[in-house]
C-alpha cells in the first residue's frame, strides 16, 4: 500500500507547444515531464525560439509526438519553490532524434550553450496513462 505524506500541487500556464500528433492517447502511452529552474531573464524565449524548433523538426519528421513548455503560476506550500517551468514530451518508442537543429557545428554549440546557461533541468519523470473514460 502506498501512503502519500504530501501532495505537491502546481498550477501551470501553457507558454508554447508543437502540434499534438499520432492520434488520441491510449492506455499505456507514456509522457515525460522535466522540471526546470529559470536561470536567465530570456529563458522563456530560449525555449520558444531554440528548443521548440528542434522538437518541431522531430515532430515533422515523425520522430516525436509532442513537446510543450509550461510556466508555474501558482503552487501549494508543499510544492518545490525553485521550479519555475516544466517541459513536457511524448516520445515515439524506438525513434531516434536527429543530432542537431543546425548543421553548422559552431552555431549548434552556441545554441546548446545558451540553452544550458538559461535553465537548470531537474530529473525528468515518466507518466503512464492507466485510465480513460469516454
Q: How would you describe each model-predicted region?
A:
Residues 26-36, 86-88:
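Active-site-flanking beta-strand signature of metal-NTP-handling nucleotidyl enzymes
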Amino acid at each position: 500500500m502506498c501512503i502519500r505524506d504530501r501532495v505537491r500541487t502546481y498550477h501551470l500556464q501553457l507558454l508554447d507547444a508543437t502540434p499534438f500528433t499520432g492520434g488520441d492517447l491510449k492506455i499505456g502511452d507514456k509522457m515525460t515531464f522535466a522540471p526546470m529552474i529559470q536561470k536567465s531573464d530570456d529563458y522563456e524565449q530560449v525555449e520558444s525560439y531554440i528548443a521548440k524548433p528542434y522538437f518541431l523538426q522531430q515532430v515533422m519528421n515523425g520522430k516525436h509526438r509532442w513537446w510543450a513548455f509550461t510556466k508555474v503560476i501558482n503552487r501549494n506550500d508543499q510544492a518545490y519553490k525553485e521550479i519555475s517551468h516544466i517541459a513536457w514530451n511524448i516520445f515515439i518508442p524506438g525513434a531516434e532524434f536527429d543530432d542537431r537543429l543546425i548543421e553548422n557545428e559552431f552555431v549548434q554549440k552556441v545554441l546548446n550553450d545558451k540553452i544550458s546557461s538559461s535553465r537548470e533541468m531537474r530529473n525528468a519523470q515518466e507518466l503512464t496513462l492507466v485510465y480513460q473514460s469516454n
